[in-house]
A protein has these predicted regions:
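Cleavable N-terminal export/targeting peptides
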Residues: 1-31, 286
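Short loop/turn motifs that connect adjacent beta-strands in outer-membrane beta-barrel proteins
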Residues: 22-34, 63-73, 108-125, 153-162, ...
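Transmembrane beta-barrel strands of outer-membrane/channel proteins
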Residues: 38-42, 73-77, 126-132, 163-169, ...
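Transmembrane beta-barrel outer-membrane domains
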Residues: 51-55, 93-99, 119-121, 138-144, ...
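Residues on the lipid-exposed face of transmembrane beta-strands in outer-membrane beta-barrel proteins
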Residues: 60-64, 102-108, 147-153, 165, ...
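Surface-exposed loop and membrane-interface regions of Gram-negative outer-membrane beta-barrel proteins
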Residues: 74-136, 224-228, 256-273
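Outer-membrane beta-barrel transmembrane domain signature
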Residues: 164-241, 252-259, 287
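Outer-membrane beta-barrel "beta-signal"
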Residues: 273-287
Length: 287
């Protein structure tokens, strides 16, 4: 069979760091290949909608590779400490109690039993990206499935590079007009660059990923756009267990909202802020 890629061969696992513990003695709920961590994250000016959010939330994250299956995902509990700006609602104040994203890929090479590499494209996958925001009710809920084709790209360098191309099916979308339809596409690029290791056992890694969504029929609606770009840049300083992250994320038409458009959601006019930088800082434990 085609050899499964290790965590170091793919940029799909966005939290690349040293193994959480020695292979022996991880217990019934741990494994050598499945990595997990819990992180408390503070965020500022996050523009997935027309009103930027500030929040402190708890995130459970996992990643790993087993046979043909490459897994990455996370589950967030918004506003876990009850701290956020006026736009922010979470688990304790009738907002969303749960937000999650899961990005499994299945190796076509592995299932075919041979390498299907072409030039720099060294492995191929059936790829998915499922994003779900539970919301407080159906009008405040989002449920999106991206499905398509993915690949790992040989850069002949320390840079790990992966790419995915998806079509999007939209179930709920906070009441938007594109609900329950196939609507647009996503081109996704992920890249990981190990920067350095230190005498204290820590490592410093740059992790980046860019999502370009395009072709949405939302462009036909007032104050909405057919495309959206989110570019994320992460610095991860990680020990065997303890992890520190700093993130700068750039939004353009975040959530398919037109930056600067005048809106009114029932509490007065305001101008959408869907372009610009948002920031995160986190402290976590990998196990």
């Amino acid at each position: 069979l085609a050899q499964p890629a290790s965590a170091e061969d793919s940029a799909q696992g966005e939290a690349l760091s040293p193994p959480a513990s020695p292979k022996e003695g991880k217990g019934a709920y741990f494994s050598d290949w499945f990595n997990q961590d819990l992180t408390l994250i503070g965020s500022k000016d996050i523009s997935f909608g027309p009103k930027p959010n500030d929040d402190i939330y708890l995130e459970y994250e996992y990643f790993g590779r087993k046979g043909p299956f490459e897994l990455y995902g996370y589950v967030d509990v918004p506003k876990i400490l009850g701290i956020g700006n006026d736009n922010d609602k979470g688990v304790w104040d009738h907002g969303s109690p749960l937000f999650m994203e899961h990005e499994p890929r299945i190796s076509i090479d592995y299932l075919a039993g041979r390498s299907l590499a072409v030039g720099p494209f060294k492995e191929w996958y059936v790829a998915f990206d499922w994003i779900y925001d539970h919301g407080s009710n159906s009008a405040n809920r989002a449920n999106t499935l991206y499905s398509g084709l993915g690949t790992d790209i040989d850069t002949h360098s320390r840079v790990n590079l992966s790419a995915n191309f998806y079509g999007r099916y939209q179930w709920e979308n906070y009441g938007a007009s594109n609900e329950y339809s196939w609507d647009g596409y996503r081109a996704q690029l992920k890249y990981i660059v190990p920067i350095s290791t230190f005498d204290n056992g820590a490592s410093l890694t740059y992790i980046g990923f860019t999502n370009f969504d395009f072709g949405s029929d939302l462009k036909n609606d007032p104050a909405r756009t057919g495309n959206s770009t989110v570019a994320t840049n992460v610095l991860l300083y990680a020990f065997t267990h303890l992890r520190f992250t700093l993130v700068g994320r750039y939004f353009h038409n975040g959530g398919n909202w037109q930056d600067g458009s005048e809106l009114n959601f029932g509490d007065g006019n305001f101008r959408a802020r869907s372009d610009g930088w948002g920031y995160y800082a986190g402290v976590g434990y990998q196990f």
